[in-house]
């Protein structure tokens, strides 16, 4: 099986690059890697495909990992961009390369919250990937709680409950961030 690599250009100011990338991935039966440029921002998106279990001969997008829009000139993205170098990714076969590329992209989503690209010893990589996934989920949960709290038709009591729930989720988010930092500094538990 082959992999499709595409470079796409979008108009400056377009912020839904990850969503557009997901739509483009569905157009191809092969695994795809997209480099999307929108003005000064970039997005790297990797789609892994598999054979459909329901429809014989068909392929479906199994998983999509996307960076979202980022400024490649910002210093905190330097390590991530370096990690994308061909020689630094797994070279066993094309599938291993693609899975490693996908994991590298998944780890990049933590840059915004942590302020750095998480790198760790190989023995801790799976744990780091699981923690960054949890970090993503908790960050989305905090964002969702903030949006609910800003709702115009929410009572004062409901707002207070949401605030307490949000503070607890933020505490958990900080704990996961601390655990990620420990792994990256070589002091994993």
Regions found by a protein language model. Give the residues of each.
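Residue-identity detector for glutamine
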Residues: 1, 53-56, 91, 148
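N-terminal, leucine/charged-rich tether regions that mediate assembly and partner docking
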Residues: 1-52
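Serine/threonine-rich low-complexity intrinsically disordered regions
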Residues: 11-17, 90, 121-124, 176
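Generic structural signal of hydrophobic/aromatic residues within well-ordered alpha-helices
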Residues: 20-24, 98-101, 105, 176, ...
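Catalytic nucleotidyl-transfer cores of nucleotide-processing enzymes
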Residues: 43-64, 68
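Negatively charged, Asp/Glu-rich surface segments that serve as flexible interaction/assembly modules
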Residues: 61-152
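Alpha-helical oligomerization segments
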Residues: 122-189
């Amino acid at each position: 099986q082959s992999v499709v690599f595409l470079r796409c250009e979008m108009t400056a100011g377009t912020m839904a690059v990850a969503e557009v990338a997901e739509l483009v991935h569905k157009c191809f039966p092969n695994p795809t890697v997209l480099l999307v440029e929108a003005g000064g921002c970039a997005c790297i998106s990797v789609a892994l495909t598999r054979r459909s279990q329901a429809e014989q001969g068909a392929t479906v997008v199994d998983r999509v990992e996307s960076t979202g829009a980022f400024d490649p000139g910002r210093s905190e993205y330097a390590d991530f961009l370096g990690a994308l170098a061909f020689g630094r990714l797994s070279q066993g076969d094309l599938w291993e390369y693609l899975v490693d590329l996908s994991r590298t992209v998944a780890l990049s989503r933590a840059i915004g919250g942590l302020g750095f690209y998480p790198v760790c010893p190989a023995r801790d990589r799976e744990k780091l990937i699981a923690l960054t996934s949890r970090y993503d989920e908790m960050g989305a949960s905090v964002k969702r709680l903030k949006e609910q709290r800003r709702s115009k038709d929410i009572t004062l009591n409901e707002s207070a409950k949401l605030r307490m729930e949000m503070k607890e989720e933020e505490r958990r988010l900080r704990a996961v961030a601390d655990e990620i930092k420990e792994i990256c500094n070589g002091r994993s538990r």
